[in-house]
Structure formats: C-alpha cells, structure tokens
C-alpha cells in the first residue's frame, strides 16, 4: 500500500508497521482531516502497487484508542458476514440451523395467532440469529497497549479492511510496547500506518520536518 498527498514529492510505501511523523502542527491536522474525509477523490491518495485506489470502506482509522468500540455495529456486521460465509462451507451445519430457526419461527407464529392484536413476523435469517445470540468480540483490554493489540487483531480478521491507520497511538506506548506491536503486525502480515505528531524514539520512520523536508531515519 502507498500513501501520497500534496506535501510529498513521491509516495510513501506502507508495508506492515510504517511510521510517519509530521512535525508541523497545521500540516498534521490537515492530513488527519483528509484521512477522515477520505473518499478516493481528494488530495490524499491511497493505492496499491498496481495503482488501484483504496476504497473508503477498505480504510480503518482509529484516533480515540480507549474509546474505540471493537464491537461497533459496522464491525459486527462484517464479522457476521464472515461467519455466514464460513457456514456456507458447511452445508450440513447450515441446513440444521435453518431447520431449527424454521421450527422456532413456526412456534412463535402459533403464539402470534393467539394474540389479541394482528401480529406478523418476517422469519429469522442467519445474521439476525448471530445478533440474537449476542455474538461479539471478547474484550479483555485494561491498558492502551492491550487495546492497540486488540484493534490490530480485529483488523487482521476483517477481510474488507486493507489499511489500518492509528493516529498518535505511540504517544501512549513505551518503546517496548511499540516493539511488541510491530512484531505482532509483522507476524500477522497486515499493513498499519502510525501517523504521529512527535518523533517515535528508537524507531525507523519517515519524518516530515517543519521545512517540509522528508527523511527516513531512526530517531
């Protein structure tokens, strides 16, 4: 994956864990705004090696780490879709589930007939069953570091998301924690961009200084 915007002379390649530090506050804020407004048409360009642009739905952006809900409706919808696809590979199991949900719908239908009001039901589809069962991601994070790892794990399993961007995440992590996150990202072979306003210590990174000169160095 590659990123380009007006302050860069050439695109930056995002491969596994990539760090980009922008020292000028206004430029940093402008890029954050472009990321949030990304539609594939503004000055921010995200694309792969074949020059194919990243779709807005393929971008996963996190600023408020502790406040980020890994069990958001959008995330659960993707997970339910993956589970349904998994069931499609097991026709016997899916058939059994459909028979059981059909029986449940039939029993409830009998009760609706006996109710004083005219009631109807639409039946149960598989994804609605997942929701009714309360299927969600188990969350055990107590620290910002654990939450970063948790979010990265979620990104790993969301097949429709191709790029995760953390904004100012390293501000809250120790050098050792950053190293563990980098190792986890590498192990899972996902692309993650860490956009920072301060230099990340002891880490190779792209640094855009106050004079808009881009360098790649270890701070």
Swiss-Prot record:
GO biological process: defense response to virus
CC cofactor: Ca(2+)
Residue ranges of coiled coil: none
Residues annotated as binding Ca(2+) 2: 118, 138, 142, 150
Chain residues that bind Ca(2+) 3: 122-123, 128, 132
Keyword Ribonucleoprotein attributed: no
InterPro entries in the record: CRISPR-assoc_prot_Csn2-typ (IPR010146), Csn2_sf (IPR038600)
Sites where the protein binds Ca(2+) 4: 132, 138, 142, 150
Gene3D superfamilies assigned: 3.40.50.11940
Cell cycle as UniProt keyword: no
Keywords: Antiviral defense, Calcium, DNA-binding, Metal-binding
GO molecular function: DNA binding; metal ion binding
Domain of life: Bacteria
Annotated Ca(2+) 1 binding sites: 118, 122-123, 128
Function: CRISPR (clustered regularly interspaced short palindromic repeat), is an adaptive immune system that provides protection against mobile genetic elements (viruses, transposable elements and conjugative plasmids). CRISPR clusters contain sequences complementary to antecedent mobile elements and target invading nucleic acids. CRISPR clusters are transcribed and processed into CRISPR RNA (crRNA). Binds dsDNA, binding is disrupted by EGTA.
Cited NCBIfam families: cas_Csn2
Family affiliation: Belongs to the CRISPR-associated Csn2 protein family.
Subunit structure: Homotetramer.
The protein's name in its UniProt record: CRISPR-associated protein Csn2
Record gene name: csn2
């Amino acid at each position: 994956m590659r990123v380009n915007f007006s302050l860069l002379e050439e695109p930056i390649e995002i491969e596994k864990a990539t760090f980009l530090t922008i020292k000028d506050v206004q430029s940093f804020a402008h890029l954050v705004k472009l990321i949030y407004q990304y539609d594939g048409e503004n000055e921010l360009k995200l694309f792969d090696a074949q020059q194919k642009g990243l779709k807005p739905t393929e971008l996963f952006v996190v600023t408020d780490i502790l406040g980020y809900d890994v069990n958001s409706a959008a995330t659960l919808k993707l997970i339910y879709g993956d589970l349904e696809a998994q069931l499609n590979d097991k026709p016997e199991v899916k058939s059994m589930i459909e028979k059981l949900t059909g029986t449940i719908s039939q029993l409830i239908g009998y009760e609706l007939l006996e109710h004083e009001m005219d009631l109807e039901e639409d039946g149960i589809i598989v994804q609605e069953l997942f929701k009714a069962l309360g299927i969600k991601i188990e969350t055990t994070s107590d620290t910002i570091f654990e939450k970063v790892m948790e979010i990265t794990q979620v990104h790993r399993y969301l097949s429709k998301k191709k790029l995760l961007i953390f904004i100012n995440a390293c501000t809250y992590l120790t050098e050792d924690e950053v190293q563990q996150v980098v190792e986890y990202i590498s192990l899972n072979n996902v692309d993650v961009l860490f956009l920072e306003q301060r230099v990340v210590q002891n880490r190779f990174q792209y640094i855009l200084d106050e004079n808009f000169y881009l360098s790649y160095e270890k701070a």
